[in-house]
Amino acid sequence: MQIKIGEIESKLNKIIEEEGAAYFVLIDPDEKNYREIANHVKDYADAIIIGGSIGIINLDEVTKDIKEITGLPIILFPGNVDGVTKEADAVFFMSLMNSKNTYWNMTAPTLGALTIKKYGLETLPMAYLGIEPISKTAVGFVGEVNEIPQKKPEIAGLYSLSASYFGMRWAYLEAGSGAEYPVSNEMVGISKKLSGINIIVGGGIRTPEVAYEKVMSGADVIVTGTLTEKDPQAVVEMKKAIKKAGLDKLKMLSKK
């Protein structure tokens, strides 16, 4: 049986292939000013990720609002089995591979699978990898993450390779929301080189310069969330840096 890639994933792959990198903005549905954030980012992001909260209220309404405001692909990033709504376009069907708790590795996605099928959501199979300093953030605490040390980039590379063998097409290297520092360039590069799948990098990316470095190191997607909440206008320069890096990376690869 041939594996079918859905419309949203195909669209994102095309952006990555033609522009070298994509920019996703993470919006927390619990943010009171989510409509304002959505209005600010709609002309700059390639897709919107919704999620990251515990005990989300009014997820259907929030997702519908953001979709209507932005007109962009809406991808769910569930913090638990209750983080799914039929109002989205797709969902990251993910495993927190380096959690110490099997609930986050496999049980949670298994429990949510039937709801996803019922809603007809497109699934993007993804390895979610918690990278130092994620243990100091909410997701690290809740997800009981056995964080991957920054000084051991090859471990993230092996997880990403393992994910590709499991059939996952995306790996998210996550330092955590509001992290003190981002995933290292070396770790990004090794993960991309070993796995060949789409590498998403998020957490601690506060400046366009850092975003540029991550893309040039091998990142296919950059995610910002906390930065966007604090300064919605920051997405303008962030997009410029990501897209410039994407084109520069394509030129560099074409010469090899």
From Swiss-Prot:
Belongs to the GGGP/HepGP synthase family. Group II subfamily. Sn-glycerol 1-phosphate binds at Y172, L173, E174, A175, G176, S177, G178, G203, G204, G225, T226. Its cofactor is Mg(2+). It holds the Pfam family PcrB. Keywords: Cytoplasm, Lipid biosynthesis, Lipid metabolism, Magnesium, Metal-binding, Phospholipid biosynthesis, Phospholipid metabolism, Transferase. Mg(2+) binds at D28, S53. GO terms for molecular function: imidazoleglycerol-phosphate synthase activity; magnesium ion binding; phosphoglycerol geranylgeranyltransferase activity. Pathway: Membrane lipid metabolism; glycerophospholipid metabolism. This is Geranylgeranylglyceryl phosphate synthase. SUPFAM superfamilies: FMN-linked oxidoreductases. It is found in: Cytoplasm. GO terms for biological process: glycerophospholipid biosynthetic process.
